[in-house]
Structure formats: structure tokens, C-alpha cells
Amino acid sequence: MADWSTLPVDLLNMIAGRLFSNIELKRFRSICRSWRSSVPGAGKKNPFRTRPLILLNPNPNKPLTDHRRRGEFLSRSAFFRVTLSSSPSQGWLIKSDVDVSSGKLHLLDPLSRLPMEHSRKRVDLSEFTITEIREAYQVHDWRTRKETRPIFKRVALVKDKEGDNQVLGIRSTGKMMYWDIKTWKAKEEGYEFSDIIVHKGQTYALDSIGIVYWIRSDLKFIRFGPLVGDWTGDRRLVECCGEFYIVERLVGESTWKRKADDTGYEYAKTVGFKVYKFDDEQGKMMEVKSLGDKAFVIATDTCFSVLAHEFYGCLENAIYFTDDTMIKVFKLDNGNGSSIETTIYPYAQSCFQMFVPSFL
């Protein structure tokens, strides 16, 4: 067996330079003493230092050290694939964010940002292999640590032409906004957008009638690709195997849901999905009948794809989503799928098993 502790420092530096996140770096440095000493941990030279808090302060005259400010900040969450080190072939999907005051990780419901119910207060990470697979953002109020009102249904952190961070967000009304140092400003007045995604370092937005736009580094919008048919439901962008897809949620008639406090809200039940992909040869969007061995995860703040066999219970050719806070799955089955409705916690051995880690 090879002695991994004798690998040359130059090679270890090359490996470390290809790691994705701070968690992977910690795992790398825990292998042995020579690996730990080859790459810095905490400090200025750490390639994955804690991200600085991005503050969105509407009153620039107030000092940013004033914790009573009525400002906003960009809240980052991340999705992880977690496997037992002794059994790495399959794992669970978890989501977490970081408390801006304590720096501690909070586990969240994977398809929303609601706190996840669990009995364990601490988890020994040395027993697991953890890989970050996706990040997502929301704009939160500094005082409440909750979403701002009106809310942003989608938020993206992008690079402008100077290489600096720029925050783009889509309001619940569909209006595209960007943060201009002092205030939020609207982009592309008269248009309504449904999603935004960073794909291969480029930013794309999807409007409410199914047109995809490329957003340049100077925040100019350029139409990219043809219209995706008639609008019939909510549409999202999903990256899969280096390409992006458009997922359309089909909804039925709205019904009125009553809460325990006698208030109510309008709720449209999901009845199906359609998936589209741009066909270069035909120059148009084509409906996709099968996702193969992939599954799409449609969270409230981002979307992404996974290899089904890498997660416990995950179905191939399926779309996981929430409907009125309930996790469901939709099998495409050549375009003739059916939705499975359930609460996930009684079903730890079912197709929702990947959302219920056995160690929590």
C-alpha cells in the first residue's frame, strides 16, 4: 500500500488548489501531519477563509459597526453530500447556513430555509466525508435575521466587469434588482423574471414568458435562446452535466388553505413538470422526456442536479420539490409522471431517505 504521507509538497499544493470549500480543506488537512503542514489552515493564506459578510446598508451615513442599523446582509447557505467514511458510495443531502453572530452552522430543511428538526446537538465530523455541492443566497434583515419584506425569491452573487462582487435579486413581483452601493435599483423595467443562475462563470436569467437572457459583466441583458413555448406555470433554471435546463412547474386550480389561527392563503397544487433543453442543431428549446440517472432538486432558493445512485433512496429521472412546505417527488417517466405526496420523517427508508440523515 502506498504511503500517502510521503507525497511531495508541490503535489499536495496542487491537490489543495483544486478543493471546493473550507470543509474539504479541513478534511484534507486531517489526513496526516505532512498533509496538514503543507497547506495553511486558519489565517490570511487559507484559500477558503471565512467569507466576509456582505452588508447592504441603505443608510451609508451610519457606520457599519453600528449593530442597530436597519440594514440588510447577504445570507449564504450551502448544500452538502455527507457520507460515512466507511461507506462512501451513498450519502445524504444536508443544507446549512452560518449564524452571523456566533459563527456556528445551522442545519436547514434541504428544500427550504426552515430550521431542520433533529435531536443531536453535536456531530463528530471525523466519521464522515463532506462535500459541498451547491450554494444559495437570500437577502436578510440585519435585526430580525429573516428575509426582507418584500422578499427576494431568487438572489445571485455575481462578478461585475471590475471583478468585484455584485448582488442581483428577483423580487416576489418578478422585478430584477441590483445593489448599487447605497440602494436597490431596478433592471430591465417592464420585464418580469422567474429565476437567475450562474453557469460556467456566466449569469443567466429567465423571464416569466420563457425567454433566457445572458447578463453581461456590465449588467446589460442580452437575449439568449428562443422562447420556451406558452407560459403555463412557474419556471426555474437547473444546471446539469455542464448544461442548463428549464424546468416548468404545472399547477392546478388554486385552493384556499386555512391556518390554525383562522387566517388563510391561496395555494395552487403542483400537478406535474415539463423539462426543456436548448438544441443547438435545431436552434430551439426541446422538451426532455428523461433525465437518465439524474434527479433534479428544486429548492426555494436554488436548483441543481444530482446523480441518483449517490444518495440513499434517491429516484432516477425524478424531480424533488416542495408543495405547500411538503416534500414531494415527481417521476418523469417519458413525460407521463406522477407526484408522490408525503411527509418525509416517517419514511426514512423510502425515496426521501436522502433528506433524513441517520446520524441526526
From Swiss-Prot:
**TM spans, by residue?**
none
Could you tell me which Pfam families the record lists for this protein?
Beta-prop_KIB1-4 (PF03478)
Q: Which residues form the F-box domain?
A: 2-50
A Gene Ontology biological process in which this protein takes part is: negative regulation of L-ascorbic acid biosynthetic process
Its name, as the record gives it, is Putative F-box protein At1g65770
